[in-house]
């Protein structure tokens, strides 16, 4: 290893993607060290066990690769900058995306600063399925090579400066290749399943978890025609387009179509439902977004044609974007879209390049 080798701190989660990222960076000649982040203190037994197992797996991988593993506690930052906002959004009847917030405030802010200032890193690296490319002197965020795993939707808040300081080794690979590398290396994480659930809080029963922090208020479920057909256990447990968990499966309105959530009346604590996943009340012709983040950090004015995702794993939607003011845009879809959800993120693309995005403030309903 040359003395001039750049130092990279890899965010080690105890999963297969970060494990293979560390090895790939070693192969590329970087001086590699790992960092395990603890971001949640409200430990119940089950969560404590999961975090302990993840740390043990991260340590086992680092031992196998012959690299040092640091640990850091960002629980206070997570609570203040991610979790409290997450709760406030749910309380207001919106559906936030904690993974996006967590990337913005923890992985590419607290971690990036800690790695540079405390550990002397030249770069950080994560196991995200995205790529970076330099265009006109600025780093761009590109979709991951594996379209099934692309995670650019969750990283749209990053600036070109943050991307320039970050490496994404598995973004150039497909998931089966990553697992095969881990198996060939004999890493304990090779067959570990991908984590789901709230960022850093792990997999747990969501209703039960949310109910600890926000008291649920039961209320009426009514149809779009105003008929009361059931009771919900709390508006915060429901999101637009939701079909399961409504408890009204046996009630039919002269048709066999299932019921879907089409709106939430937060003021009166009423859940509004309709039958059919393409009911006009569920469709939107566009949206208004705010809290904008453009990767190039250039202010957006005028209009542009691009594509948008209003949720993860959605097929790109062709659209026209128009600036309303410095921090608000209007987005008009080429075709109506179902279940556009306030609180979620709208993320914009020009081909492979992620341009940035914003929070959906309101949807523009299909005129009925």
Swiss-Prot record:
<keyword id="KW-0808">Transferase</keyword>
<comment type="subunit">
    <text>Interacts with TusE.</text>
</comment>
<dbReference type="InterPro" id="IPR046885">
    <property type="entry name" value="MnmA-like_C"/>
</dbReference>
<dbReference type="Pfam" id="PF20259">
    <property type="entry name" value="tRNA_Me_trans_M"/>
</dbReference>
<keyword id="KW-0067">ATP-binding</keyword>
<feature type="region of interest" description="Interaction with tRNA">
    <location>
        <begin position="311"/>
        <end position="312"/>
    </location>
</feature>
<dbReference type="Pfam" id="PF03054">
    <property type="entry name" value="tRNA_Me_trans"/>
</dbReference>
<dbReference type="InterPro" id="IPR014729">
    <property type="entry name" value="Rossmann-like_a/b/a_fold"/>
</dbReference>
<dbReference type="GO" id="GO:0005524">
    <property type="term" value="F:ATP binding"/>
</dbReference>
<feature type="binding site">
    <location>
        <position position="37"/>
    </location>
    <ligand>
        <name>ATP</name>
    </ligand>
</feature>
<dbReference type="InterPro" id="IPR023382">
    <property type="entry name" value="MnmA-like_central_sf"/>
</dbReference>
<feature type="binding site">
    <location>
        <position position="127"/>
    </location>
    <ligand>
        <name>ATP</name>
    </ligand>
</feature>
<dbReference type="GO" id="GO:0103016">
    <property type="term" value="F:tRNA-uridine 2-sulfurtransferase activity"/>
</dbReference>
<feature type="region of interest" description="Interaction with target base in tRNA">
    <location>
        <begin position="97"/>
        <end position="99"/>
    </location>
</feature>
<feature type="site" description="Interaction with tRNA">
    <location>
        <position position="128"/>
    </location>
</feature>
<comment type="similarity">
    <text>Belongs to the MnmA/TRMU family.</text>
</comment>
<feature type="site" description="Interaction with tRNA">
    <location>
        <position position="344"/>
    </location>
</feature>
<keyword id="KW-0820">tRNA-binding</keyword>
<keyword id="KW-1015">Disulfide bond</keyword>
<dbReference type="InterPro" id="IPR004506">
    <property type="entry name" value="MnmA-like"/>
</dbReference>
<feature type="active site" description="Cysteine persulfide intermediate">
    <location>
        <position position="199"/>
    </location>
</feature>
<dbReference type="Pfam" id="PF20258">
    <property type="entry name" value="tRNA_Me_trans_C"/>
</dbReference>
<feature type="region of interest" description="Interaction with tRNA">
    <location>
        <begin position="149"/>
        <end position="151"/>
    </location>
</feature>
<comment type="function">
    <text>Catalyzes the 2-thiolation of uridine at the wobble position (U34) of tRNA(Lys), tRNA(Glu) and tRNA(Gln), leading to the formation of s(2)U34, the first step of tRNA-mnm(5)s(2)U34 synthesis. Sulfur is provided by IscS, via a sulfur-relay system. Binds ATP and its substrate tRNAs.</text>
</comment>
<keyword id="KW-0694">RNA-binding</keyword>
<dbReference type="GO" id="GO:0000049">
    <property type="term" value="F:tRNA binding"/>
</dbReference>
<dbReference type="InterPro" id="IPR046884">
    <property type="entry name" value="MnmA-like_central"/>
</dbReference>
<feature type="disulfide bond" description="Alternate">
    <location>
        <begin position="102"/>
        <end position="199"/>
    </location>
</feature>
<protein>
    <recommendedName>
        <fullName>tRNA-specific 2-thiouridylase MnmA</fullName>
        <ecNumber>2.8.1.13</ecNumber>
    </recommendedName>
</protein>
<keyword id="KW-0547">Nucleotide-binding</keyword>
<dbReference type="GO" id="GO:0005737">
    <property type="term" value="C:cytoplasm"/>
</dbReference>
<dbReference type="GO" id="GO:0002143">
    <property type="term" value="P:tRNA wobble position uridine thiolation"/>
</dbReference>
<feature type="binding site">
    <location>
        <begin position="11"/>
        <end position="18"/>
    </location>
    <ligand>
        <name>ATP</name>
    </ligand>
</feature>
<keyword id="KW-0963">Cytoplasm</keyword>
<feature type="active site" description="Nucleophile">
    <location>
        <position position="102"/>
    </location>
</feature>
<keyword id="KW-0819">tRNA processing</keyword>
């Amino acid at each position: 290893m040359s003395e001039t080798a750049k130092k990279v701190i890899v965010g080690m989660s105890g999963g297969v993607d970060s494990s293979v990222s560390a090895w790939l960076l070693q192969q590329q000649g970087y001086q590699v060290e790992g960092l395990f982040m603890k971001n949640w203190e409200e430990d119940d037994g089950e969560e404590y066990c999961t975090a302990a197992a993840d740390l043990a797996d991260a340590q086992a991988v680092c031992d196998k690769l012959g690299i040092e593993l640091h640990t850091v506690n960002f629980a206070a930052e997570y609570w203040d900058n991610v979790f409290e906002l997450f709760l406030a959004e749910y309380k207001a009847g919106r559906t936030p995306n904690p993974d996006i917030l967590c990337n913005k405030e923890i992985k590419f802010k607290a971690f990036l600063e800690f790695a540079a200032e405390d550990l002397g890193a030249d770069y950080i690296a994560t196991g995200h399925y995205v790529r970076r490319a330099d265009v006109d002197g600025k780093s761009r965020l590109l979709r991951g090579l594996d379209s099934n795993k692309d995670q650019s939707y969750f990283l749209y808040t990053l600036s070109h400066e943050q991307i320039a300081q970050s490496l994404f080794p598995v973004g150039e690979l497909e998931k089966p290749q990553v697992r095969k590398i881990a198996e060939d290396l004999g890493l304990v994480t090779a067959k570990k399943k991908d984590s789901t659930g709230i960022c850093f809080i792990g997999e747990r029963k969501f209703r039960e978890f949310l109910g600890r922090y926000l008291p649920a208020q039961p209320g009426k479920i009514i149809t779009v025609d105003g008929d009361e057909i059931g009771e919900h256990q709390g508006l915060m447990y429901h999101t637009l387009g939701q079909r399961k968990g409504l408890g009204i499966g046996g009630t039919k309105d002269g048709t066999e179509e299932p019921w879907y959530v089409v709106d939430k009346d937060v003021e009166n604590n009423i859940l509004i439902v309709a039958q059919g996943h393409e009911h006009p009340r569920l469709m939107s012709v566009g949206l208004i977004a705010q809290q904008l983040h453009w990767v190039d950090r250039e202010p957006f004015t005028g209009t542009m044609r691009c594509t948008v995702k209003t949720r993860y794993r959605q097929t790109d939607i062709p659209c026209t974007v128009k600036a309303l003011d410095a921090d608000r845009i209007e987005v008009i879809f080429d075709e109506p879209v179902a279940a556009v959800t306030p609180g979620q993120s709208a993320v914009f693309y020009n081909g492979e390049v992620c341009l940035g995005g914003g929070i959906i403030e309101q949807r523009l309903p299909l005129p009925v």
